[in-house]
Structure formats: C-alpha cells, structure tokens
Amino acid sequence: MPKKTSFVFNSLTLGLLCSFSHASSVIEPGFEFHGYAKGGLGISNDPILNAEAYDWAANGMNIFRLAGNRYSDSSGGRMGNEANWLELHFNQGFTHDHDMAWGLNANIVYGDELALDELYTQADGVFTQHSNARFWAGKRYYARVETVLNDMQALSSDGLGFGMDDLDVGAGLFSIGVTRNLYNETNLESGDMVAVSSSLRKIVLPKQIELDVFANFGTFMGPAVSDDNSNARELNPNAYQLAFKLHRGDYFNNDEFFLRYSHNTSMSITRTWQQTPSYQIGAFYQGLKHITEDYRIAYIWSHENAHFDEAARKRNYTEQVDAHWNSLVLRNSLAWNQRTSTEIETGYEQVRFTATDPAQDGTNSGYKLTVSQNLHAGSGYWDRPVIRFFITYANMDVETLVYQHSNDGEQIKMGESEATTIGAQFEAWW
C-alpha cells in the first residue's frame, strides 16, 4: 500500500476508548485540545522482512507485515511492530443560542508529513423536535468501525462531505452521510468514488447486547463520466457494503463481533487505493477481559475473504482468484504496581491464495512474539502515558507473490525469514 496513504490505518486517537461504543459528545462552548501520539525506536541487525513496511515505519523496527496482507499495516499485533503517529485535535464550541450548539473541529496529523486530516463544522438542535440530531459538513473520519490490537478500520467512509448523525428513530440512532475520497489518491480532474453511508446504532437486544447495522453505497462521479474515451466507470464500478456489529460490555470487560459484506470494494469505498475485489467478506471478533484487577487479556480474530472475477482481476492488475486472510492476536497484561507492568503479545497470521495459474497457488504465514516491560502513569489497562521497552521476534514463510500488482514496488523474499527487534516506544492520549 502506498506510503503516503498507509498512515490512515494507524489512527487510533481516543478511539481506543471509544471503539466499542459510538456516542456523539455534547458540543460544549469554548476551546478544547486533545490528541493521540505514539513513537519509538527499534534496532535490528537482521535482514528486512518487508521493505515496504520497513520504509513505512521509518523508525528502525523490522516490521512484520505478512506478504499478501492488504488489510493492516502490521501483522501479528501492533506492539513493538508499528510506525510513529501523532494526532492533534482542536475543537471550538460556540455559545449556545436558540437552543442550538455549533462547533468547529480540526485534526492535524503527522506520520511522515504534516496533514490536515479533518476540518468540519457540526450543529446540534437544528430541529427542535429532534434536538439530538447532529448536522455536519467538511472533511473528517466517518462511519468507522475500529479494531484495537491490529490497529485498522474494518469499515470506514472517511472523506469530504456532509451528513446527519444520531437521529433518534425509536429503535436506535440513525445516521447518514455523503463522502468522497479524503486523501486525493485519484485524479480529481477525472472524478472520484462518492459514498452514501448509513447506519442504525444502539439497537438494544436481550442480555445487554447492542446491535449496530450499516448500509453503504458508492458510485463514481466526476467529469470522466461524460468522456466517451474514459474507462473510469469500468475501473470504478458501483459498490455497496452491508454490515452489522454486536457489542456487549464496557471498557474493561467486553466482547464485540463485526460482520461485513462488500461488493466491488474492500473495507472502504472512499479509500480508492485499496483493492476492489468482486466481493469481500470480513469478520472480526475482539474483546478485553479483566481476569483479576491486575491481570488482563485482550484478543482479536480477523478474517477477510476476497474473490476476484475476471473484471476484478483486470482492474486490480492481479492474477489472484481468491485470498483468505486470518489473523489472531492475544495480548496478556500484568500490572505489578502503579508504575510498572509486563505485557506479552503473540500473533499468528495466514493468507491462502488461489490463482488463475495453479502453479502460483500458495499459503503465506507467519507469527510474532513481543515481550514488553512498561513504565506508566497508572496500573489500569487504559492508563497513559506509557513507555514500553520491548523485544519482538517475527517469523515469516512466503510461498507465493501472486497477490502483487504488476506495478508493485514491494520487495519480499520467498521462503522462510525471521527478524528480532529491540527498542522502546511511548503511547499517550489526552
């Protein structure tokens, strides 16, 4: 995946605390500043596992990103295996007049360069009978479903656009928005994929389970549509996504299951650098358990099944027919006291490919183990800031490169390879 766009997968921000529930905060008058940051240094004398991933991180960590993983920036978990990242959020709430509340939000990020990822305004109370409905317009992260341990969005519609969120319709909160590509990966003179994203959230089910349902549709729009010599429609067919999420628990003990079906797209309609298979099915199960007050286990299983018919192979410049990705990550955390803790993160990942030429069929697999001794501001699982001193070992076995595009710059060694990284990193949010 291109370096200048891969940073979007790293953004957790305060979503680490919000990934299991979505609720619009009240727009308060005045200025607010908050953010998220992580950074570190790795040292490894072993051959580079994945040159593209190593360049993406640019911090010395010998990143384990399994060959053929098109879904997350790192494999086997993010601890001791990720790039540096910064988000600075600035929010200005205006004085409440006429029972309305208005706000302006900006988000400046830094991965390998500064960028203004979000700039939008929002308003509550525009409709007096539906005062909780929030209208917005601008540039923002939108309709995201986060996964924590492998730091990715299983669903998103980030972009420039407008919409309405959290209209109470009785059964739940209804949201709808229109967005187009935020990161300018396509030629804006030709056009872009435009997504209409909708959701009905916080549907209460028995046994304290909450249900969210999602339905998104995307189509190519722009000057190229009226150009008889353009193949923009062929390369960007209409797409849709249907998904649901089940959640039970709170920030400290929870389980979540997410299932998504995508047609002519992957995890996001507006991230136009992602592959566009004829269909893709994603399933994710994640959770956190406090076994005791000081010992916790976090876990995630991730699955993507992508199928490429002839048209999809043509527009993606690939010879793969099917790709089955499975990833399992387990993080154990033991707090010794208010100042120190130890974490052990293990992960296994596999991608099985079938190709138009059976000789190119194969399974790529690998695993990662990270042991980290931590210094932190408190003993809670979510307490930050934290400094981690870690050692990471990764092993990767590559049987096929059929997933590569004809213009890929990814440098991957066939066969088995391994690498060890020692280093330190910090993580903070405020």
Located regions from the model:
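Cleavable N-terminal export/targeting peptides
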Residues: 1-30
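Surface-exposed coil loops of outer-membrane beta-barrel proteins
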Residues: 48-76, 117-120, 127-232, 405-415
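Beta-barrel outer-membrane channel/assembly domains of diderm bacteria
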Residues: 22-130, 167, 332-344, 389-430
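Short loop/turn motifs that connect adjacent beta-strands in outer-membrane beta-barrel proteins
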Residues: 24-33, 46, 91-104, 126-134, ...
